[in-house]
């Protein structure tokens, strides 16, 4: 099946079922279907009134697909630090005042893919990425997005829920310094602690020790958490409980801090789906990714968005450099110039 010729589709890599491709026409629904497969595709704000996208057909794709097409020519425009610097200053002011512990500004880099290449080719590049990542995509005739994320929001099988805290970033060659970096450790523990506190009222939670996850081009701190829930809950319940974690949201997480984050993201022109939940449901098994390491398109115009956590010890120069490091990592993951 030639993905480049499909006018609409949804794709995800499931941890046990591999690559799954949904093809249209899609039926959209406010609730998941009683049976059969469905994709969950929402915005970061969780404001899509019909986030369940039910495909006309579901296809299992081979793990070893066709090689990606020749690299396209993309004209990238360097993002200006001015708007980011203003948002960073406002965040630091609120942190100093005790109103915030952490927040995550996200800023895109814009570009244009030159014909005859089309952005749907990016999906083929995502599929051929590292096996330690999860490709995902959603597209219509004129727009769409795809990504290669290492981060899961959760995997629900009955009452069992598995999730992770993935926060703190460095280059692999800096691991010796990274494991003792107070700023990166604090950023990670804010995320892990927040997830633990949100899950604990619902049952028994186990947590692994903090460790380093090496993804080749970047390293992160990771903590895995497992909940044995006292009661059965819907995927929507867990999505609203966990999204956004402080890895992409604000801590503390209140209506006011989330509204402020939404304003900051809008001012930085962050795509609506960046960092949003992206999931797949079938037969009571719901697997949900965090939509990062991604590219968005309308026509031939592209946006490559990255975010980074800001805490009390953050500096503008360090955070701006980290955003560039993450953009470069995304490009390498897609084998792009």
Q: What annotation goes with each model-predicted range?
A:
Residues 1-12, 69-118, 122:
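Terminal domain-start leader segments
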Residues 1-43, 47:
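A generic N-terminal leader/anchor concept
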Residues 2-17, 107, 111-190, 282-307:
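An anion-binding catalytic pocket shared by soluble metabolic enzymes
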Residues 18-20, 27-28, 169-171, 310-312:
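Short, surface-exposed beta-strand-loop junctions and turns on beta-sheet-rich folds
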Residues 37-66:
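Small-residue-rich
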Residues 40, 98, 154, 193, ...:
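A residue-level signal for conserved active-site and pocket-lining positions in enzyme catalytic cores
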Residues 59-82, 87-89, 111-113, 162-264, ...:
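Contiguous alpha-helical scaffold segments within structured protein domains
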Residues 228-337:
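Conserved hydrophobic core element of enzyme catalytic domains
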């Amino acid at each position: 099946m030639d993905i480049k010729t499909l006018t609409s589709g949804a794709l995800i890599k499931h941890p046990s079922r591999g690559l799954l491709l949904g093809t249209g026409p899609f039926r959209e629904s406010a609730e998941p279907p009683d049976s059969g497969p469905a994709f969950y595709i929402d915005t970061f704000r969780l404001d899509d009134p019909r986030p369940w996208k039910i495909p006309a057909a579901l296809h299992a794709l081979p793990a070893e697909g066709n090689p990606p097409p020749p690299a396209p020519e993309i004209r990238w425009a360097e993002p200006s630090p001015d708007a980011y610097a203003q948002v960073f200053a406002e965040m630091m002011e609120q942190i100093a005042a005790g109103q915030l512990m952490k927040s995550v500004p996200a800023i895109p880099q814009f570009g244009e893919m030159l014909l005859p290449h089309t952005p749907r080719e990016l999906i083929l590049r995502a599929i051929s990425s590292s096996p330690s990542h999860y490709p995902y995509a959603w597209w219509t005739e004129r727009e769409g997005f795809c990504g290669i994320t290492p981060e899961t929001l959760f995997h629900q099988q009955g009452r069992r829920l598995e999730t992770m805290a993935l926060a703190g970033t460095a280059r692999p060659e800096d691991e010796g310094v990274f494991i003792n970096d107070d700023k990166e450790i604090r950023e990670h523990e804010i995320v892990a602690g927040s997830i633990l506190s949100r899950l604990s009222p619902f049952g028994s939670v186990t947590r692994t020790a903090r460790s380093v996850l090496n993804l080749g081009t970047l390293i992160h701190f990771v903590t895995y958490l497992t909940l044995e829930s006292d009661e059965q809950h819907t995927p929507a319940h867990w999505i609203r409980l966990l999204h956004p974690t402080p890895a992409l949201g604000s801590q503390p997480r209140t209506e006011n801090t989330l509204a402020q984050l939404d304003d900051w993201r809008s001012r930085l022109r962050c795509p609506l789906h960046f960092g949003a939940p992206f999931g797949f449901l079938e037969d009571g098994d719901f697997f949900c990714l965090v939509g990062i390491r991604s590219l968005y398109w309308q026509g031939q115009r592209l946006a490559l968005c990255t975010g980074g956590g800001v805490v009390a010890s953050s500096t503008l120069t360090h955070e701006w450099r980290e955003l560039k490091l993450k953009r470069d990592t995304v490009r390498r993951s897609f084998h792009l110039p």
